[in-house]
């Protein structure tokens, strides 16, 4: 099948922002103006195309990343609308990994909010070029210039206005296009008709000053343009566009636009900017990976004639077609019905059907090419972060890292009939979401589910009921504590059994040591001279990993440790993988007990917005919750307190804050890091856990 759009006419973009900045509303308008939908859906009415889950329509928030495609000015734009709520950060992380560019939406009143910072840092991590869109210019308190200042100060970016608003709040009626030096005035409510005029006289001075800044910013990153500018004092429209595109692709500049998506103003110029300034798959560096056989580095150019390579970035269960695997094609082609090699798991799989998604509607396609973002049916073992490639030319692309869950609840089925269904439902939901974990409490045998926050787990339980018809009782939220060690220690692990016939023999000497926070688990073998045959070494690793699931202090999972296998011995007849696995587990537990084990708890980054008169009371309360105040700032006549507070102290905080501030305070929090629990508190937690 011939390619419908040349690769340079393709844009893979994400729309990202803080909750309620207007991402989904902006996407709805994009779909309307590109002719993808013929009636505008509204988030507050529960009819938004991209928010297709029942929970999204009820709550007016985006939970999953919905994918869709549309066309504008001969370009195919693949859009992923991502959630803004902090509990669903994983959705943003995996979307940014496979996108080429992004539109960051900001609220003109709130400016840069906490989750805006989080998604911006995630985009920085993957080097994603982006443009900023300051939305809600029609709201009371809208301030375009403060928005730009906050992008500069709080995100450390280099924002450059390429538009100015005409009017503000109720009077917002259009934008000044600084590149073309013209004004665009919207003349109807739907925003489909607009007229282009001279810049209004009252804005002429400001527009000239901002246009000069724009030209200087563009010329700064391009010597030939700088020379031309110094000679003529001016650049043509085409030169400004080319310079802006180059600087945006190099992540040196963030072009800033404005509008009001809800009032249908400013969306078509945003579409133009997506086409003009965001990258095509051919503009980004070739993807790098590793050959799983030789370990050598591999490069895949974004071309159809290269060997096939793709990254699976999301799994979804569809009630009609079963398991859907979303993937981004980096190079080559793949036909529907053909076989593909999962190099991460060393498995060959058959692609039953390939679908192009429009939110939750699907369109079958016969073949995908480089640069496409599509979903496949029929991949049974593939999970998030796996590489799919050509079996003759294998490659493993860099995967994604996901944060550890911070909160857990016990869950039990209401009836015997729900028991079996619950296991299947939880397994499917865990496949879809890498930050959602299912485990069993070793003491009580209860099923525990862990996630990124109360809303995250609430949605999971809700989905179990709606999609899998499982009724469950849910316990009170608990903190997902972890354990780690503070010093090096070594120990022996011996497992010897002599019962008539063949016995069991495994003997290892292990050293356990602390690693940097967030660096995870690392196993190293220093066995030389075959004192332990190499086929038994992975079993020692597996035994240590298994022992880490229940730590030595209070049975919490152990994180950030290194295990080194130093020595051991084996028996010609009696040794087996099982014996070495058990020996590894015994050795790890013994070494961990000697390595000064400590309890860790999740610490949240909290931002509280209150009136000045309540400041003292709120700060005193945060201190009593073991909080550490970082800084305070004034914003829009309110006081903003930034603090780090342990999650254990934040349950019920919303109600508490409301009563302290007479309902006028609000807060946001997101996971920051794990930190050691103070000894006096750790003793109580361990006693409750062990003594029940």
Curated annotation (Swiss-Prot):
> NCBIfam families given for it?
EF-G, PRK12740.1-3, PRK12740.1-5, PRK13351.1-1, small_GTP
Q: Name one GO cellular component term.
A: cytoplasm
Which keywords label this protein? Answer: Cytoplasm, Elongation factor, GTP-binding, Nucleotide-binding, Protein biosynthesis
Provenance organism: Pelotomaculum thermopropionicum (strain DSM 13744 / JCM 10971 / SI)
Recorded GO MF terms? GTP binding; GTPase activity; translation elongation factor activity
UniProt-listed CDD domains: EF-G (cd01886), EFG_III (cd16262), EFG_mtEFG1_IV (cd01434), EFG_mtEFG_C (cd03713), EFG_mtEFG_II (cd04088)
Q: Give the InterPro entries listed for this entry.
A: EF-G-like_DII, EFG_II, EFG_III, EFG_III/V, EFG_IV, EFG_V, EFG_V-like, G_TR_CS
Q: Where in the cell is it found?
A: Cytoplasm
Chief subcellular location equals: cytoplasm
Q: What is this protein called?
A: Elongation factor G
Residues of the tr-type G domain: 8-282
Entries under PROSITE patterns matching the protein: G_TR_1 (PS00301), G_TR_2 (PS51722)
Which family, according to the similarity comment?
A: Belongs to the TRAFAC class translation factor GTPase superfamily. Classic translation factor GTPase family. EF-G/EF-2 subfamily.
Q: Which biological process terms from the Gene Ontology are attached to this UniProt entry?
A: ribosome disassembly
User: Which annotated residues bind GTP?
Assistant: 17-24, 81-85, 135-138
PANTHER family according to UniProt: RIBOSOME-RELEASING FACTOR 2, MITOCHONDRIAL (PTHR43261:SF1), TRANSLATION ELONGATION FACTOR G-RELATED (PTHR43261)
Q: Name one Pfam family in it.
A: EFG_III
Record function comment: Catalyzes the GTP-dependent ribosomal translocation step during translation elongation. During this step, the ribosome changes from the pre-translocational (PRE) to the post-translocational (POST) state as the newly formed A-site-bound peptidyl-tRNA and P-site-bound deacylated tRNA move to the P and E sites, respectively. Catalyzes the coordinated movement of the two tRNA molecules, the mRNA and conformational changes in the ribosome.
